[in-house]
Amino acid sequence: MKDSTDKDFTAHTPMMQQYFRLKAEHPEILLFYRMGDFYELFYDDAKRASQLLDISLTKRGASAGEPIPMAGVPHHAVENYLARLVQMGESVAICEQIGDPATSKGPVERKVVRIVTPGTISDEALLQEKQDNLLAAIWQDSRGFGYATLDISSGRFRVSEPTDRETMAAELQRTNPAELLYPESFESMDLIENRHGLRRRPLWEFEPDTARQQLNLQFGTRDLTGFGVEQAKLALRAAGCLLQYAKDTQRTSLPHIRGITMERQQDGIIMDAATRRNLELTQNLSGGVENTLAAVLDCTVTAMGSRMLKRWIHMPSRDIDALQQRQQAISALQDITPDLQPYLRQVGDLERILARLALRTARPRDLARMRHAFQQFPDIREQLAPLDIDSVRRLVSLIGQFDELRDLLERAVIEAPPVLVRDGGVIAPGYNAELDEWRALADGASDYLDRLEIREREKLGLDTLKVGFNGVHGYYIQVSRGQSHLVPIHYVRRQTLKNAERYIIPELKEYEDKVLTSKGKALALEKALYDELFDLLLPHLAELQQSAAALAELDVLTNLAERADTLNYVCPTLSDKPGIKITGGRHPVVEQVLREPFISNPLSLSPQRRMLIITGPNMGGKSTYMRQAALIVLMAHIGCFVPADQAVIGPVDRIFTRVGAADDLASGRSTFMVEMTETANILHNATENSLVLMDEIGRGTSTYDGLSLAWACAENLANRIKAMTLFATHYFELTTLPEKMEGVVNVHLDAREHGDTIAFMHSVQDGAASKSYGLAVAALAGVPKEVIKRARQKLKELEMLSNNASSSHIDGAQLALLGNDEPSPAIEALEAIDPDALTPRQALDWLYQLKKML
């Protein structure tokens, strides 16, 4: 395109001049330029769209003496193409014809009516119904980060101020924005460079005074103190840029964005990016959604409920009062869940319908769904009436009634409206007398035409005569070619077909004009009445949004009640005393995919028992046992019941996992480097109220290096940090730690050998494992028998070399290396010597003495 626009602008056709003017306003994004029934793309946009969408690249005539590269998509299928582009992280400007071709001199007037970007979509066809779709902005300076997210399809506006890179990375992973705005001065590009939907913005868009002004204008406030964000200077920079971008792309006001909320780390259990990934909360390690915690817990019946549940899972709360209210509601709802859920299912995705209402893009079927939702409210209230629980009563009051709005929509919109208002037939008969009159005139055509056909056929004696209509020529009287010579002179030929002639007569032409006028008037009036419905509904937007949020929460709680009942979960006790005590704990995901019964296990952590050294064979269940502890704690902190016979959960501020690792090739980091980075994060940030899972630390280096690191990390966690720690290891040397430190206990996962086979008992027992069963597991995995046989021989040789009867005994040299805290006499003597004060004879004597000390 650049080459063409460099030429004299006037050398182009008027239509292309119009195109270039509009394209200049949106140089970075694709421009869908409406021409009749198609959206066309030209020049570089056409080439790019052709590649992305796999559509034909053609040429359209010439402009300025050169052929114009062109690609196009039909207007009726545009949503499908937009959805594909948005999923690729692309943005599109939609340019519509707003002038009347019949009255336009020169090109029809056009303008960009909306900009579709990955983070600002609200159309049902473009959104994934069970996932939040977030627009985000990020700011960074020497004090840390400012981060803002907006879900334009609900109006949810959040800000936070992560203090370091690890916290910022965790926020990006938790929120997973579809589109991310960042300043041109942004330094930590490695944090974001692999994300889709990146948008580089000029620095002035992050100006703090402008941000405050924008936000106060949006919320109708004088300052932001009431939202608790007045002092969040970094976050406000990001929020200001984000809000301006949303307004620029939507080309309309955003009345559903009515406030902003500060998210503070201390309000919830903090999890870093590695922990979220390893616990497979909403996404498994392969990137899918199967066999995740969300997959087990999410049987919600509305999409907005599903999205809320996932937000709860990713932000476990530490507000004990709020969690206990959720527990009480779940207990109360268990008896009525089967009766309540069918009504909730009929409510649908009210949250996103309201966003489209606010943006004035709601379609007729959105209004029909809203009406259907309102019709469920009396039944929902009736179901909840017997429950005398504060949290349930609060939800009932927020849901509201909206009888007047339901009545309005029942009177105004037909039962099953068409997709688009421009198709007509949306407003119900009887709602507006004038509309009914115009429709009667238009709809009376068939009776009139039947009468005209019978009259003319009998009058002229032409048995082939019939009256019809088509979209090109309008109304006509058709006579067969064989009888066409018999028509009277006032029949004016309108169209010739192979076997027939079509005519128009003055009476029919006059009626045609009247019918077409009435259809046009009816459609214009219907559009005006439809717009008026928005004006009648929007004053209630705030209460409607509260109602939708309450219904989503009710759906989540009812769903968790059903899950607790179906999956045999128990209500955990949330205690203010430190520690975790679980009886008969189960892994919520693994127990669902196992064919055989899951072996439940206890867990006890307290200030006197703060670290478990976990040993046992590979495949014995160490990782499952550790993860289930973290998941039970997390579930308790979303208010959910848990898979256990009994659970008492004390204060937990963070959950850390150092479980498994893979190379981070994109960042040039080896498995061991990834492992050590995650370990460093734990050692720097864990507290005595943190739950820490450490699985096989130190595997990626030599035995002595790995053992030394594992020992030192365990020591640090147990003695300095005093965190609640599950420490799984194959280094049997670590099983001596309980002898050296208070609060450290050995447990193991049991297994039994029968000849060449091994049976995993999956039960947690006190004490250290007797052996690792590595060769038995290798045989189970299908390692050739000759290799296993050779390994057994080699094992015996190694055991003999270390003077051990079995591999469970501890290498004395390694224990000396790690466990000997006594200072060496030789080293003490050396430190006391002043070499400059010694004669050669004295130096030689000292050398002999030091030799004896070793």
Curated annotation (Swiss-Prot):
Which region is the signal sequence?
none
Q: Name one GO molecular function term.
A: mismatched DNA binding
* Gene Ontology BP, a term: mismatch repair
- Domain of life assignment: Bacteria
A Pfam family per the record: MutS_II
Gene Ontology cellular-component terms for this entry are: cytosol
UniProt keyword annotation of Transmembrane present: no
Q: Which UniProt keywords apply?
A: ATP-binding, DNA damage, DNA repair, DNA-binding, Nucleotide-binding
Give me the residues that bind ATP, please.
Answer: G616, P617, N618, M619, G620, G621, K622, S623
Looking up HAMAP family in the UniProt record yields:
MutS (MF_00096)
**What is the stated purpose of this protein?**
This protein is involved in the repair of mismatches in DNA. It is possible that it carries out the mismatch recognition step. This protein has a weak ATPase activity.
The record's PANTHER family line, in alphabetical order, gives: DNA MISMATCH REPAIR PROTEIN MSH1, MITOCHONDRIAL, DNA MISMATCH REPAIR PROTEIN MUTS FAMILY MEMBER
The record's comment on protein family reads: Belongs to the DNA mismatch repair MutS family.
Protein's UniProt name: DNA mismatch repair protein MutS
> Which organism is the protein's source?
Pectobacterium carotovorum subsp. carotovorum (strain PC1)
